[in-house]
Amino acid sequence: MRAVVCRNWGGPRELTVDDAAAAPMIEGGLRIAVAAAGVNFADTVMIEGRYQNKPPLPFSPGMEVAGRVVETAPGVKGFKPGDRVFAKIDYGGYAEEAVAEARFAWQIPKGMDMTTAAGFAVVYGTSHLALTDRAGLKPGETLLVHGAAGGVGLTAVEIGKKLGATVIATAGTPSKLAIAAEHGADHLIDHSAEDVRTRVLELTDGRGADVIYDPVGGAAFAASLRSIAWGGRIIVIGFASGTIPQVPANILLVKHIGVLGFSWGTYRLHRPDLLTGSMETLLGWYAEGALKPRVSMTFELAEARKALEALLGRKSTGKIVLTTGR
């Protein structure tokens, strides 16, 4: 099979497209003929050798796929060859075949195409559990979303609205803010032209945001500390800016706030029940029409380097997806 292969730690330019052996079947597994694979910021960290779970070289990146089941392990129920599925895996998704645990695979709902399905699990799963299980977002609260037109940011806007929050979206261009508005944001802040703290306080009658969703880090995190309400919660999703901020403990004390770490992938180990329950909820919301997944760019498998460079260059909104032609 063809696969994108990482043989040396580094950036996207280190990747090659080669013939590779198919992954062995695992207990409780599904073999999937991959039609599409989601591209995530974590993939860039993984190929640099900086991800928390460092795979052995060589490997294929890619932690979410969509395609058709071609084989099931003995004893697997609920799936059969030919089923259209999407799945969360550790890595190995940038390939023509992948093996996933059946418990972390889901039937693709009617009306959802393979490209959309490939980009659904990570971004929607992240935002849903971050806002519900970790941050405890309540109806009537104010949610501030940084990077609101990006992959996870856009889903946080949608889910925040579904949960009954007032959503303030930040982004760096008017066009990106317009996309956040299309997905339900109540208020928009152009951080390249406006002071985030000043605008948040204006929009909340001086109170600040109850929950702040931050996949950006750097200057966005600094703005969060200045924009948070008393007793508020900042949830750390990632560091798309490339800068990992330091947390001044004195501000946490004085403002009576919490800074919460979040790692969606670790729910597979520690709370798989929450992860699978969350995905069922999200699929129900999708069926209702409450979620509108956005894939702004697609690339062929052989163009994986270009896809990752587009992600790192912040050229996309919503998701980037690779397609295999299968």
Predicted regions and their residues:
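Mid-domain Rossmann-like dinucleotide-binding core that forms the NAD(H)/NADP(H) cofactor-binding site
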Residues: 118-194
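Short, glycine/polar-rich helix-capping loops at beta-to-alpha or helix-loop-helix junctions
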Residues: 93-96, 171-179, 244-249
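NAD(P)H dinucleotide-binding glycine-rich loop of Rossmann-like/cofactor-binding domains
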Residues: 33, 45, 56, 84-147, ...
